[in-house]
Amino acid sequence: MSRFFIVTWVRFRLNAIIPIALFISGTICVAQTRQTLDSGWEFYQGSVGSIWEIWRGDKATDNVTWTPVILPHCFNGRDSVDPDVRYYQGPGWYRTKISIKNPYTEGRTLLHFDGAGQKSRVFVGMKNVGEHNGGYDQWDVDITDAISKVDSQAALPVAVFCDNSRDSESIPSDLSDFNRYGGLYRHVSLVYCPQVSLQRIHIESAIGEGSNSIVKIRARLYNPTSYRDDIELSIKIQDGYGKTIHESNQKMSPWDDEKEVEVFNITDSKLWSPTSPHLYSCIAILKSKSGEGGLKERFGVRSLEWIEHGPFKLNAERLLLRGTHYHEDHAGVAAAVPDEVVRQTLKSMKEMGVNFVRLGHYQQAPLVLDLCDELGILAWEEIPWCRGGLGGDSYKQLCRDMQRNMIDQHFNHPSIILWGLGNENDWPGDFETFDKTAIRNFMGILNTQAHQLDPSRKTVIRRCDFCKDIPDIYSPSIWAGWYGGRYIEYKAALEKNIRDTPFFFHAEYGGDSHARRHSEDPEKFLGKVATGEGTAEVGKAYKADGGKARASKDGDWSESYMINLFDWHLKEQESMTNLTGAAMWIFKDFATPLRPENPVPRVNQKGVLERDGTPKESYYVFQSYWAEKPMLHIYGHTWPVRWGKSDEPKLVKCFSNCREVELFVNGVSAGAKLRDIAAYPASGLNWMVKLKEGTNFLRAIGKTGGAPIIDEIVFQYQTASWDKPDHLTLNEISREGDVVTVEAHAFDKAGTACLDASEVVRFGVTGNGRLLDNLGTSTGSRVLQLYNGCARIRIQCGHGGAMASVSNEKLETTFLKLQNSK
């Protein structure tokens, strides 16, 4: 975590005294005070004729309409998953007015951006004071000189232009399987700093003899006015409990570039690891005639070792990397993910048992890395050179700049163990020529720059076989059971790639699942899928049509199938002593422009959480293998109606890390079973039981050596078979205030529920009502496929009521009158 430490009491616009502390992450962002500028902004989506239009107010009658917004804010909070319209890519404007009260003599005033998409320009009044290209690295604009030209008694007018228009000469490519979002979707801050101040400190630690470690500190100044009087630098090191273990103080002259300013030893070092993420603090204070201030940087002491054709070691002990992936994307806000949601998401990762995350496919917000440090989650962070090929000089410079900024800004995070050079760079399409030699040469340039900036960490890429010898670590395409082959081929694919790749890691496995869709026979399609023909994603295998038989095209996209696939993958991973690790794709469903035909349109549904953070059943499969805290989960909490013949044995699975689980079916014990992690399915915790027509009650009791753990589910069992869907029903199932949840069901001519129906339905509303849609979830899209013959959506119902509807292109539209409860 990069954080300004010195707290200065500053009076801002409010009539209150508030303490401000700065997270430093930008290119030149250094200060002693920081005010986060989340409120007081207005937004306009579109272009203007000139900067004067931003400020002219009542001097014209045809002004554009401005909307009040709170930062972070994304252009595409709702339209990124609109089933009918592709998401907006173009210009947008933000404006605000800021009171300036810099407390430092000849101090500097900056605007700090944690990230803005994708190209940005900053204006103070009519003056363009700075520009930035790139949507993910942090950057700053020094507005000191511009302030002097504005009335000092008036609030400072600030406008920010953001543009996420398509541009093949920038990264990431629009061929990427995620949106290139626009807007001020990370925090913006007002920063004050003295005339000369610390711009950055980099901390290197190495484990020495015994339990000692050696720490080196390098520092860089922000000194735009070439201040040359003597300065004083003091450094204090504290352990994770706040105890001071080292102090120093030295007077010196200002320096240029980066300089080593301190070397010292830590005796009896406490090592950073997933089980004990101990963080030290380095507090650096710089004093000058202009004032004093400093930085507080956290760091960890740990060692990394990648064994050739073998496992990964952390602190000289083998650690199987149990990983996932994370996109900055959330229902209703897109890239403007609130801090509390980020915290909850990373906490949910840790509770699942994750010890590794690949941050796909770009530099992420400071809070994400801070949480990885605190929770003990190792990380792979990469630049967004993703698909499309290789552009010209400006394209290459942007790649180099983004890599330089990422490593410079996130250097001190002990969680980061890999720097990613790119992703799927074998994917052509943005340029007339796809030159593999040029891509190889540029990949080598990035690899060299990464090692020059940070010799302590390895480099890595995923899926570009013609470049696999360039980075230190390589991750090939292995999608056993989804894009290629069957999941039972997974271990053989791993073993082959471990043999063929000196330093191997497996990033991306899994598949899509439509939340709430379950199946009694999820593998009935497997007879079509050939074995022995490879497990890689080839060509356009991500599309739902064309090519050879595969689960992504011929499967049912049920949670049931994905549970089987994940269960098998995890069983195999745990048995391989030479495996470095693997990371499933992905933790949460996310928006993508490439998949309009998915069950939830424009959503990549490979997450173990829905886009709003709701867990799917597969979350608990991972937890049963990885979590240390005792857990027990009967599969089927979101499966309200199962089906089959009378007296037909049905499979019940419990996912648990308890040593023994006993299952009760309608009050009668079906027996206790011991957990065996090498057994499949569910580590041996599975039973074939007979269910009765109507309501069934399952209860499982897990034994842990302490208090027992209990899980229960209630569901219906239907023995009647059904024909094709004939009609839809629509009913209100719950109400909270003025928000009504409605549920559609498909029935055949005889009135029997069609429990495997997967037709596309469309919800609508007229009158004084509003669909709570464009969320990209199984209950938050107006267009989606049925899951087990049903679908839900919420409707906000106003005074006078509304008329809800559900339709299918082959079935008659059904209506439901809704009344406001007030």
Descriptions of predicted regions:
Residues 218, 346-349, 356-614, 618, ...:
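Substrate-binding/catalytic cleft of secreted carbohydrate-active enzymes
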Residues 72-100, 104-113, 117-125, 130-131, ...:
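Active-site-adjacent substrate/metal-binding segments within catalytic domains
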Residues 217-221, 652-656, 732, 738-754, ...:
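Beta-strand-rich structural segments
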Residues 294-299, 707-719, 812-821:
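Edge beta-strands of extracellular beta-sandwich domains
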